[in-house]
Regions:
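Canonical helix-turn-helix DNA-binding module
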Residues: 46-88
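Amphipathic alpha-helical dimerization/coiled-coil segments
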Residues: 21, 101-116
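Intrinsically disordered, low-complexity regulatory regions
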Residues: 2, 6, 94, 115-116
Length: 116
C-alpha cells in the first residue's frame, strides 16, 4: 500500500522524527551512519566496506569512520572475511535491530500525527 504525502508533510515527518531522536536518544547518528545502518538491515547480506562505499558513493575511509562509531555503539559489528582477508564483513547486532525497531515505531507514530 503506497502512502501519499505532500512535500510539506514529508519534510515535517523528517523534522519531527529527527527532533525526537536528537532530544531523546543517546545515539545521535549522522545521515551517513543512519544510511549505513539501514542498508545493512534492510538489504540482503553480505555487506562489506568496499560494497557500502560503492553503494553510497563515498570513500572506504568514510565508511570505516562511520563503522567505528556504529561499532562503538554496538549497532553493527565487523570481522575479516576468512575467505578473502582483504574484505571486512559488516554484520547486524541485537542492539542495532532494537534501535531500528524503535526508529520504525517512532516514524509510524509521527506519521499518524501529521496534519491531513
Amino acid at each position: 500500500m503506497a502512502v501519499e504525502l505532500r512535500a510539506s508533510q514529508a519534510l515535517k515527518l523528517m523534522h519531527d522524527v529527527n527532533l525526537t531522536l536528537v532530544r531523546d536518544s543517546e545515539q545521535d547518528l549522522s545521515a551517513r551512519q543512519l544510511t549505513i545502518l539501514l542498508t545493512v538491515y534492510l538489504e540482503p547480506p553480505p555487506h562489506t566496506v568496499r560494497g557500502l562505499a560503492a553503494k553510497l558513493n563515498v570513500t572506504k575511509p568514510a565508511i570505516t569512520r562511520a563503522l567505528d562509531t556504529l561499532g562503538g555503539m554496538r549497532l553493527l559489528s565487523r570481522k575479516r572475511d576468512e575467505a578473502d582477508k582483504r574484505n571486512v564483513i559488516i554484520t547486524r547486532t541485537v542492539d542495532g535491530a532494537l534501535y531500528l525497531e524503535h526508529l520504525g515505531d517512532l516514524v509510524s507514530e509521527k506519521a499518524r500525527e501529521l496534519p491531513r
